[in-house]
Amino acid sequence: MPKYMAEWIQWPERVKDVREGRYFDLPPAHYEGIFTLVCNFLCPHCTRRTTRLKWVDGGTWNHNTPISEANTLHPTGLRRVIDELAELRVDNQMGIIWGGGDPTSNPFTYDGMLYARAKGISASFLTNGVFLEVDRCLDADPTLIRISLNCGTEEAYRRFHGYPKGWDYFAQIKIKMRELVRRKIERRAKTLIGISLIIDERNINDVVAAAEEIRAVVDEVGPGIDYVIVRPVMNYSHFQRDYAMVRDGTKDRARYMVEPGGPVWTILNELGIPLILIKDSFDQKPEAHFYESDSDCLAYGLCGEIRHNGDVQLCSDSYGNPEYTIGNIFERPLRDILKSDRRREVLDRINGMKCYETRCPHNSRGHHHNRVFHQIEAMRRAGKMDEVAGWIDDMRACTHDLGHSFFI
C-alpha cells in the first residue's frame, strides 16, 4: 500500500547500523528536494508558509514570484546536488522527493529528474498539478506522481488554495488530471498516480465532491488512479496563530467521511481505488509520558532535505528552519557534512529542546521511525536484541521490497 513504514528492514546496511545503534552513521534513504520555493498557490495551511515568508531571501509568499537564484536551484547547482546524492547511494537506494514550492514552478525540474534517473536515483513528484507537463514528467519514470486536489468545486478549490477569483486553476487541474491518467494508460507507465485530499474547515463540505470528481476522471478516461491519500490539515509547531489551524471536531467529521462506510470511502471503494488514511494525522499527539524514557531523536539520518540554496537540513521534518541547517553542499561535500561536528552540534541542540517531543510532527516519517528505533533501544537495554533480530527477519519475510523509500 502506498504509505508503508517498514521498508528500512529491506536495506541490509541500514539494518546493520540500527542493530548496532549507530544512528549517526545511518545512510539517508532519500532527500526532500526543495529546489524551489516558488508556487502559484498561497494555501493558508501550507507547510512551507513560514519558509516562503521568512526563510528565503526576498520571500516567495505571493502568486507571481519570478524564478531567481535567490529562490530556485539552477541547473549547475542541481546537477552537483544530484551527483553528491548518487555517491551516497547505499543498498541500491537513494531517492529525491521533488517538492517545493511546487516543482512545476522550477523550469529545471524535468531535466533534473532525467539526470537523477540516469544516476540511479528514484523520484517522487508532489505537485498541485496545475502547470504539470505530463509527458515530460512521465519521461523521467518517477515512482509516483501525486496531485493535491483537496476539493471538487471551483469556489472551494479557490478558497482552499488561496488564489483570486477569475483565475482558471480549477478548470486546469481537471484537465491535467485527465491528461495524466490518459497518458499513463496509453504509455503503460509504471508510475503510480495518487490524489491527495487534505481536509479542514474550508473544504470539509467539498470532499465528497472531490471524490465525485475522481470518479468522473475514471469514468471518462479509465482506471489510471492508483490510490487516494487523505489526512486533515496538520497544526505544525512552526505555524503562527493566524495560519489555518484544524479543529478536533473537524478531524472527527473527516474521519467519518473517509472510514469504511463513509461517503468518500464508498465512492472510491466502488472504483476499486485504495483509500489510504494517514492515521496519525487523525489521532491526537502522544501524551507527555510517551516520551519519558528517552526523547532524543534517533531517526534524523534516515531522510533529509536539501533546499533551494544548497543548505542541508538535519532531517526531512524541519521545513527549512535554519536552526536545523547542518551545512551547505556548495561549501562542503555532502558526505563530509554528514560526518561533521556541526551536524553533531545541531543534533545536540535540538535534542536539548526535546524536538522529538515538542516539534516533530507526530504524523511524520521521522516521528514514526523514532517510535520504532526507541522500541529497539529499549530492547537493547533489556538485553533482548536477539528478539529484535527475529522481528526484523519476520518483517522482511512478510513484506515486499518496493525498491524505493517514498512510502515509508
Residue ranges and their predicted role:
Residues 1-30, 45, 49-56, 311-408:
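Flexible mid-to-C-terminal extensions adjoining Fe-S/redox cofactors in radical SAM and related proteins
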Residues 32, 36, 40, 294, ...:
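Residues immediately within or flanking Cys/His clusters that coordinate Zn2+
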Residues 4, 12-13, 34, 50-60, ...:
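Radical SAM enzyme [4Fe-4S]-AdoMet core and its adjacent flexible, acidic
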Residues 90, 182-185, 342-346:
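Generic structural signal for secondary-structure transition and capping sites
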Residues 1-136, 143-144, 246:
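Conserved alpha-helical substructure of the radical SAM core
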Residues 40, 110, 131-132, 154, ...:
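Alpha-helix N-cap/helix-start and coil->helix boundary motif
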